[in-house]
Amino acid sequence: MLESTEKGGVRNSIRNCLTVFQNDPLLSGAIAKNLLTERTDIIKPIGYNRTGTAITDTDMNYLLLYLEETYGLTSEKKIAAAIGIVANENGYHPIRDYLNGLSWDGTERIRTCLHHFLGADSDPYTDEALRLFLLGAIHRAFHPGCKFEVMLCLVGGQGAGKSTFFRLLAVKDEWFSDDLRKLDDDNVYRKLQGHWIIEMSEMIATANAKSIEEIKSFLSRQKEVYKIPYETHPEDRLRQCVFGGTSNALDFLPLDRSGNRRFLPVMVYPEQAEVHILDDEAASRAYMEQLWAEAMTIYRSGDFKLSFSPEMVRYLKEHQRDFMPEDTKAGMIQAYLDRYTGSMVCSKQLFWEALNHSFDEPKQWEIREVNDIMNHCVTGWHYFSNPRMFPEYGRQKGWEREAPATDTSNGAEKIPEGFVEVTEQMELPF
């Protein structure tokens, strides 16, 4: 029953508009908020031809006409307010609904998927990299804003199907985007809004030192603060997407001696693939559906972590070197240390003697670079923080050669080569 004015007419109130949207046979259950796109959708037929689900200006005109002719409600502002309220009370999430509706057939596909479509190696790393990416995408859908900052990066020649893989992995084309070009754009949220898997094509390969730090920071972000144009107040928009990288260049990773832990490179070899992903798109999409069903089975079990195992972290650090430019300075320093006979070195010494800058005073960033190499790339030396005296360089912090390992398997120390163990009979008589 609608509220009336004192003169007996229908009151143009938000309450009356709400009553109509909640009880009218045509409109009841038609308005809902899409929790993925954060837009208002019309999710059932309401008496006229329309395409898509998101509410449009044309939809609003039809609704205004219907409420005016059927109920005498004419306040556009109050009708719009009622639509916002009823939508907020009837939220749905298309990706969650899709994932919850999957049933796995029991055939494992995660372990071999990247080999099947792209010819990647079938090894524990490739398996764990894809598994982590899938579980991260699922967790972002069910828990927007959760911490997940890794990017699966597919590397290989043009035409291998890398971009198509991510597009089909997103299930629906509207859940995929490759339109992200600038990370510092104030409207970057609009590029992410409504998408589940975002491809960053060649973005890392073309990045300089400054922009790669921006990419790392961007991947680590868990939300965007953004005001949708028709809204009054800005809101925290929690991330619901994950990012996949593609590159034709082998050495696409920046030279980062401390590690590029966010990037999981997988080399693809299309000539070794079992099928090309577009040979039969319907079959590929059916495969992807069962891939997600398998991942959902793992997710429901709770027996997973959104991080690599410790042994895979160690492997990743070495594996990433294959995708970085050659580190010539690290090679020069390691070669110098291999022939150096002293027991300790300092940054200035390495800058002058190993890198052949005999007459240059090192700048602060150059000292930091030497330190970075010694702390992350060189083997056989460990850092000491208490300054020691170097005849040519004064008191300096530095690194000392690690002592050779001792053999304690039989409880005795191993005697260094060239020395003889002193027995009791050989001891001096005093």
Can you name each region flagged by the protein language model?
Residues 1-109, 124, 128, 360-361, ...:
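N-terminal nucleic-acid engagement/recognition segments and initiation subdomains in replication
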